[in-house]
Amino acid sequence: MYQYAPSHNLDHIEWNHAHLIYPPNLAIPTSPVNPPATQLNQPVQMTIDFDSIIEPKLGARESISWNRNGIIASIGDEGVETNLLVCTDGQDWVLTKPTLYAPKSILQPPTTSFVTPHRAFCHVEWSPSGSDLAIIDTLGSLYIYSQYTTLSPITCLRKPPSEELTTPIDLNAIVGFTWVAPEKPVILTNPGLKAGGNEKSKQKLSDVKDFPTGQTSQLLGYSGISVTYGVSQGLHLGPRIPQGFGACIGVTRSQVLKLWTQNGPSQPYNLVKLSLNQLHSDDIISHASFAGTKDHKMLLACYSPAGAIYLYRIEVEWSKEEEPKLRATRLLKETLMPQSGAPARLTDLKLFSIRSNQVSSETEAEMVCVFTDTKGATTNRYELQSHTPDLNSTFYSLGTNDSSASSTTTHKTHIISLVETTTSNKIVNIGSQVYDSIFFAAHEDGILNFRYRGNVSSSTKGTPFNMFSDAGYAFTPLPKGSDRPDYICVSPTCASYVYKTKDGLKLRIIDNKIPDADLTVAQMVDSAFVLSLRHSVSCISAVCNDDVMMVMRREIQRVSKLAPALETQFPLLLLAESHKAINFSLDLKKDHQMDKIMINPSLQRLLTMQTVIGTQHGWTRNVTSRLSWCFLNLRLVSFSLTFTLRAIGQQKPGVAPNHAMRIHYLMSLSGLKRWCLDFAAYLCQELLAASNEGPSYFQKQHVALPMVMARSSRMLLMYSWRGIRSLDTILMQKPGTETQEAGLASQRQRELSHFTPISMTFFEQLFNVIDSHTKQVAENVEDRLGLEQQLLFQGMIPQQFLPLAKRCVDEFDKFRKTNDLSPLYFYNVSWLGLDEHYDGRPAPTPAMAPYRNVTSTGLKIDCLRKFIIERQEGSILRVCQRCAGTSVFVDSSDGKQFTGTHWTFAFQRNCWCGGMWIPESLGV
C-alpha cells in the first residue's frame, strides 16, 4: 500500500517507469471520502492498492464495427472478417457466414529485437461513409482497406511503412482513434409527443374481440390517442474537411497525435504527426477520446495510469496543395477518480459532442468514464465547460505552459462532475449512435442501458417518447453459463447488437418486455409510435434498418396472436405512422416535383418496410406487400428511363455522338419496357375479371387498380409511359449509317410493343380517363390522405372511387367488343410478382402469393434489368440480402459498360429495394 498527496497538476509525482511503459499494474488513486467540490482540481489524499486491481485494458480496442450499410467487421482467428444480416426465406433473418476481409498475414513482423514480438489486430472501425475500414494492430500500425461493393475487389489505401515497424516496446500503441466526419447537413429527429387516451385505451389487448375494418385512423380514434413528430437541423461538429477528402485521427500512448488524410476517393492516406507533450514518466496514457466542437475543432481527452486527465484542443488547417497542419492547445491537466473513493481502474473513456438544447452554452462536450474493480463498475459523467478567466490571460497561461502544444488560449476549461452511478454488473464498453444523440453502456450479461442526449421539446402538451425503452423494449440478459462478451457492438439503429463467442458472431434483437397478459391498447399504440419514430431516424440518418423491421415483424406477430381482430389494423397503423414520422404524405400536391418521388430515399425505405412486414415464409407476399413491391418497380422504371434519356440527350458540343453507347443504353431498357407493358396487361386482366364478376369484385383487395388510382403511384406510371414513348421516338430516328446492332435494337423494341396483348393506344386512352376522373374525385374529398392510404396500404377501392372503377370497366367492355382479346386470357404475368394466374386464366387475387424470380422453365430473371439471366463465362451473380432478388454483377471498372452514366450504376452497391448485394455463394 502506497500513499501520496498530489499537487494540482501532478508534475512532481515519482512513478515506477516500468509500470507506465508496459501495461500498468497500478490501481487508480482514490479518496476515502467524496471531494467537497464538483470541480476536479482539488488536492486529495490518495491510495494505490496493488491487491485490488483488475486486468489492465487500453483504449482503441473495439473488436467489432457495424457500418451504416449493414456490414459488420470483426476480428477473428484468421484476421478481420465481415458479416451482414440476410433474410433466408422471406421471414427469418440470420447472419451470413464470415468472409475474410483482411488476413492476419498482412501483419508484418517487427524489424528490431527491441520490439514486443506479439503483433495482432486490436481495433476495427468503419469510416462515416461505410466504405473504408481502419484496422489497427497492438503496436500502433494502421491499415486502411476499401471496398465499394461486397463483390468488388478490396483495395489497400494505407499500409504501414517500415519505419512504423521499429516501435520501442508499445509506446506507439494507439489508445484513441476516430474518423473525422465529413461536413454535411445534419438532420435530427426530435422526440415525439403523444396526448389523449380514453377508457378503451386501457383495455387489455387480449380482451379486444371485435374491431371494424377500415382506414388506419380507426385504431387511433378507438384509443383516443394523438401524436406529433418533428425534426431539427443540426450543426456540423468538428473540423471542416474539403470535399472529397477523407481523414482519421489517433493518439499514441506517448501522446503523439497522428492524422491520416486522403486527397480524394480511392486515394492513399498520408500521415501527419504532432507531439503533444515531452515524454515524462507520468505522460504515458492508456485511454484517449475525441469529440467535435461547434467551432470546427476537436477536443481530445487523454488519461494516464497515474490518475491524470489531459485535455487538448485540436485544430486542423486543410490545404489541397500541401499536407494538413495540426495545432494543439493543452487546456488542463488534473486528477480524475471516482467520487465514491472506491479503488478501481479506469477501463473506458469517451468524449461526446453536444447535441442537446438543454445544456449550458459554455458546455463544449460531455465525458463519461468507467472505473472497474473486482466488485463491479462505477460510471462518472462530466461536462467540459469553457469560461473566460477572471485573471489576466498572461497569468493563466503560466499554469498551462507546454513546450510542444500551444497554450495561447484565453479561456479556462473546467471538468464539472454531474452524475456517478455504481453497478455490480461489469460494463464491457460504452459508446454512442445517431450523431452522439444516444449514449449506451453495455454490460457483460448482455443488458444495455440507453440515454437520450438530443434535443428536448419545450412543449408540455404531451408525453415525450423517443427511445425503444419508452414503449417497454429492452434486451434480454444472456443465458446463465453462456460466454460473456468482452465487447458488444450496437447497431446504428440501437435495435440489436452483436458480440463474439468461440462459435463466432452472435446477434441479439431488442424485445418488448411488457408481459402478454398486461399489454393494453395504449401500450400497443405506444409501440407503433416508437417503432415508427426509430424507423424515421434510420431514414433520416441513411443507415441500414433491417433490425428495426425485424422488431416490427415480431410485434405484428405478437399483436396478431393476442388480438386476432387487430391482425390487419396494427400493420396499417405502423405504415401510417411511419409515413407521418418521416413527414412524407401520400397526398401529393399538384405541383409536386417528379424527382422528389423518384429519388427520395425515405420513400424507398418506407416502401421497403411495407414489403418486408408483409412477406412471410417462402417469400409469399400479401396484398399490402405486393402493392409496395409494385410501387418500388414503378420507381425503378421511371428513374431508369429518366436517367437514360438525359444521358442520351446530353450531347457534348464538338464531340461526335457515340452510337454504340446510345444503342447499349437503349437496349438496357428493354426489360423495363416489358415490365410496363405487362403491368398494363395485368391491369386489363383485373378489368376483365371485374367485368365477368360484377360489382362484388370491387369489394376485394387488388393491386393494379389501386396503383393507377392513387396519386403518387399514378404519377410514376404516367412518367414511365411517356418515357417509353420517347424511347420509341428515338429508335425511329435512324442514324446516317445504321449498324447491325442498331437494327437489332430497333427490332427488339418493336417486337416488345407488337406482342403485348393490349395496344398501347387503348391503355393511354384508359389511363387518361382514370387520371382526369381521379383528380375530380380527390378535389371534392376532405380526407384525401385516408383515401390514398386505403389504396396503397390495403388495396381496397374506397367508396368515392367506385364510380370511377365502374367507368373503367365500361371502357374496357367497349374496347373488347371491337378487338380480339383472346391472348389476354392466356397471357402470363406471374413474373411481375404481383399476382398468381393458373391455367392461363385470371384468378381472384389470393391472400398470399409467392414471389417468383424464375420463369416456368426454371430460368432466373434479373430483378434489376428485367431479363432472363444467361450465365456467361466470367459472369458473377449477386443476390439481395433483403428481397432475394438476383442480378448480374458488372464491375464498374469495366469501361466497355459505360457505367459512369449508365442507369445501373446507381444500383451498383444496393438493390433497388435498398438491400445490400451479396455474392450468390453466401446464399439467402
UniProtKB/Swiss-Prot annotation:
Pfam families linked to this entry: Med16_C, Med16_N
Superkingdom per UniProt: Eukaryota
Record keyword Cytoplasm present: no
Naturally occurring in which organism (per UniProt): Yarrowia lipolytica (strain CLIB 122 / E 150) (Yeast)
Family per similarity comment: Belongs to the Mediator complex subunit 16 family.
Self-association state and partner proteins as the record states: Component of the Mediator complex.
GO biological process: positive regulation of DNA-templated transcription
Gene Ontology CC terms, in alphabetical order: mediator complex
Protein name per Swiss-Prot or TrEMBL: Mediator of RNA polymerase II transcription subunit 16
Gene: SIN4
Major localization class: nucleus
Subcellular compartments: Nucleus
PANTHER family attached to this UniProt entry: MEDIATOR OF RNA POLYMERASE II TRANSCRIPTION SUBUNIT 16, THYROID HORMONE RECEPTOR-ASSOCIATED PROTEIN-RELATED
